[in-house]
Amino acid sequence: MAITAIKGCNDILPEESGRWQYIEQAARRIFERNGFSEIRVPIMEKTELFCRSIGDTSDIVEKEMYTFTDKGENSVTLRPEGTAGVMRAYIEHKMHAQDPLAKLYYLGPMFRYERPQKGRYRQFHQIGAEVTGVTDPLVDAQVLNMLCAFFHEIGLDEPTLQINSLGCPDCRPAYRAALMEFLQGRLDRLCDDCKRRFTVNPLRTLDCKSAGCAEATKGAPAMLDHLCTACDDHFSSVKRYLDLTGSRYSINPRMVRGLDYYTRTTFELVTGLLGAQSAVAAGGRYDGLISQLGGPSIPGIGFAMGVERVALLLGERDFSRRPDLFIATMGAGQRDKAFCLLTKLQNQGIRVEMDYEGKSLKSQMRRADKLRARFSVVIGENELATGRASFKRMEDGVQNEAALEADDIVTLLA
């Protein structure tokens, strides 16, 4: 019996990888345009990192992490999200000593044990960005605009930006008390998870996908009505900067996010094209996370997007990489010339294919069609003798003659 992939872990096959490369390359362009640098961190971390950052009572830590004990009796976890590992590296390598302001981005796989569904898997991939060292709301607006710019870059203007503020440690306790008072008489209508959340993290009841909980929490107090003056001013400034740049957004007072480290600005990009699980990107400010992980008191803000979900939004677009040229030969005597041309053209950045097995000309041209090559050329004895050949544009059959020299062919293909 053949071995298959683990449930919820998918292979990205060649016909799909072009779509992923398109997404990743667009993200790199946007990030680097905004002054961000790439950081790469391990996919495994000490379990304590996620317990301290995400929160012991979060669904991720309690139910979804892939955690194991290694041969050295250390508790190790496959990363369920990217921010904690990036901040661990920021602290460990004392990046803050050089400059507290860091603008970092990352790409890579994450792991959560949850029920696989459309666009959501046990191994999934995220692209994320983090900014440290600045509390100014202008940075929040830049991060939000950068995220929206990415979706515009890949031709997706449908996802809409939703924002909220979760306040700070000064104003959140009063809101927590008000929310608990509201929920007290509705506990019997909450799901079992939310009954447990009521005492440990009541804000998470607002994020529950259960229809019963959504109904029970209708009319719940809003965090926006309980912000301290500093947080209210901060959120007003974020909105003002977004308005200044003409950014489209709406306020979602029920947005709380699933990670415990968020403070003040939180946000999601949502779409109606993926069913109930509508967020394709999300993030927020985490001003206490770095100190919580043992570093200095330095603020931060960031986001992550799910690559699988973004790929779904791109629909049926064709991202395959077509060869620029297919070189066919009439016989073994012309293969040396074809191979030399192939090598020289590839070294000049041209995508070229040829037959490797001495197949018939008919078979070679069928392969050129299958690969959807832009041009084809047939090298026979006459072409070899004259040093010239006709290059056929495959979409309409138009032929142009050129010398069998790399520079001439590059000019013709341009």
From Swiss-Prot:
Q: Which GO terms describe its cellular component?
A: cytoplasm
Please tell me which top-level EC class this enzyme sits in: ligase
> Which is an annotated GO molecular function term of this record?
ATP binding
Q: Using the record, list the residue span of the signal peptide; answer none if the entry has no such feature.
A: none
Cross-referenced Pfam families: HGTP_anticodon, tRNA-synt_His
Query: Which reaction equation describes what this protein catalyses?
Result: tRNA(His) + L-histidine + ATP = L-histidyl-tRNA(His) + AMP + diphosphate + H(+)
Q: Where in the cell is it found?
A: Cytoplasm
Q: Which UniProt keywords apply?
A: Aminoacyl-tRNA synthetase, ATP-binding, Cytoplasm, Ligase, Nucleotide-binding, Protein biosynthesis
GO BP annotations of the record are: histidyl-tRNA aminoacylation
Q: Which family does it belong to?
A: Belongs to the class-II aminoacyl-tRNA synthetase family.
Protein name, per record? Histidine--tRNA ligase
Q: Which organism is it from?
A: Pelobacter propionicus (strain DSM 2379 / NBRC 103807 / OttBd1)
